Amino acid sequence: MPVSNLTLVERIARVLAGRAHSINAEGDDPSAGPNVDETWHEYVDDALSILRTMREPDPVMAAAGDPDVWERMVEAALNVEKAVGNA
Protein backbone atom coordinates (compact mmCIF):
# COMPACT_ATOMS: atom_id res chain seq x y z
CA MET A 1 0.00 0.00 0.00
CA PRO A 2 1.39 3.44 -0.87
CA VAL A 3 2.09 5.75 2.07
CA SER A 4 1.77 9.52 1.73
CA ASN A 5 4.46 11.94 2.86
CA LEU A 6 1.73 14.41 3.88
CA THR A 7 -0.47 14.09 6.95
CA LEU A 8 -4.07 13.11 6.38
CA VAL A 9 -5.24 16.47 7.72
CA GLU A 10 -3.01 18.32 5.25
CA ARG A 11 -4.30 16.20 2.37
CA ILE A 12 -7.92 16.92 3.33
CA ALA A 13 -7.17 20.63 3.79
CA ARG A 14 -5.52 20.74 0.36
CA VAL A 15 -8.60 19.17 -1.23
CA LEU A 16 -10.82 21.76 0.43
CA ALA A 17 -8.52 24.59 -0.68
CA GLY A 18 -8.49 23.17 -4.19
CA ARG A 19 -12.28 23.10 -4.29
CA ALA A 20 -12.38 26.73 -3.21
CA HIS A 21 -9.81 27.92 -5.76
CA SER A 22 -9.96 25.62 -8.78
CA ILE A 23 -12.06 26.37 -11.81
CA ASN A 24 -12.77 22.62 -11.86
CA ALA A 25 -14.78 23.05 -8.66
CA GLU A 26 -16.17 26.19 -7.01
CA GLY A 27 -13.31 28.58 -7.78
CA ASP A 28 -12.20 30.53 -10.80
CA ASP A 29 -8.48 29.76 -10.97
CA PRO A 30 -7.48 27.61 -13.98
CA SER A 31 -4.14 26.80 -12.30
CA ALA A 32 -4.94 26.61 -8.59
CA GLY A 33 -1.85 24.71 -7.40
CA PRO A 34 0.09 27.75 -6.16
CA ASN A 35 -2.99 29.13 -4.39
CA VAL A 36 -3.58 25.77 -2.74
CA ASP A 37 0.05 25.71 -1.57
CA GLU A 38 -0.40 29.16 -0.01
CA THR A 39 -3.85 28.73 1.56
CA TRP A 40 -4.35 25.10 2.59
CA HIS A 41 -3.49 26.05 6.20
CA GLU A 42 -6.72 28.08 6.28
CA TYR A 43 -8.67 24.83 5.84
CA VAL A 44 -7.04 22.80 8.63
CA ASP A 45 -9.92 23.36 11.08
CA ASP A 46 -12.41 22.13 8.48
CA ALA A 47 -10.19 19.14 7.73
CA LEU A 48 -9.99 18.29 11.44
CA SER A 49 -13.78 18.47 11.72
CA ILE A 50 -14.14 16.10 8.78
CA LEU A 51 -11.61 13.69 10.25
CA ARG A 52 -13.28 13.75 13.69
CA THR A 53 -16.56 12.85 11.99
CA MET A 54 -14.85 9.87 10.36
CA ARG A 55 -13.66 8.32 13.65
CA GLU A 56 -16.57 5.90 13.79
CA PRO A 57 -17.01 3.70 10.73
CA ASP A 58 -20.46 3.22 9.27
CA PRO A 59 -21.92 -0.30 9.04
CA VAL A 60 -20.61 -0.92 5.52
CA MET A 61 -17.10 0.16 6.52
CA ALA A 62 -17.22 -1.95 9.69
CA ALA A 63 -18.27 -5.00 7.68
CA ALA A 64 -15.37 -4.48 5.26
CA GLY A 65 -12.63 -4.42 7.89
CA ASP A 66 -11.69 -4.02 11.53
CA PRO A 67 -13.49 -1.03 13.09
CA ASP A 68 -10.98 -0.86 15.95
CA VAL A 69 -8.08 -0.53 13.52
CA TRP A 70 -9.95 2.19 11.63
CA GLU A 71 -10.59 4.15 14.82
CA ARG A 72 -6.94 3.84 15.89
CA MET A 73 -5.76 5.04 12.49
CA VAL A 74 -8.04 8.09 12.54
CA GLU A 75 -7.03 8.86 16.14
CA ALA A 76 -3.37 8.58 15.10
CA ALA A 77 -3.97 11.12 12.33
CA LEU A 78 -5.62 13.49 14.81
CA ASN A 79 -2.81 12.99 17.34
CA VAL A 80 -0.21 13.96 14.73
CA GLU A 81 -2.02 17.26 14.31
CA LYS A 82 -2.19 17.77 18.10
CA ALA A 83 1.57 17.22 18.28
CA VAL A 84 2.22 19.96 15.72
CA GLY A 85 -0.38 22.28 17.22
CA ASN A 86 -3.21 22.14 14.68
CA ALA A 87 -5.82 20.16 16.62
Located regions from the model:
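Structured N-terminal alpha/beta-domain signature
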Residues: A77-A83
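Extracellular ligand-binding/catalytic regions of CAZymes and related secreted enzymes
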Residues: V36, Y43-D46
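Cystatin/cathelin-like cysteine-protease inhibitor module
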Residues: T39-E42, A64-R72, A76
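Amphipathic alpha-helical oligomerization segments
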Residues: P2-N35, S49-W70, V84-A87
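A generic structural signal for solvent-exposed, polar alpha-helical segments
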Residues: D46-S49, A76
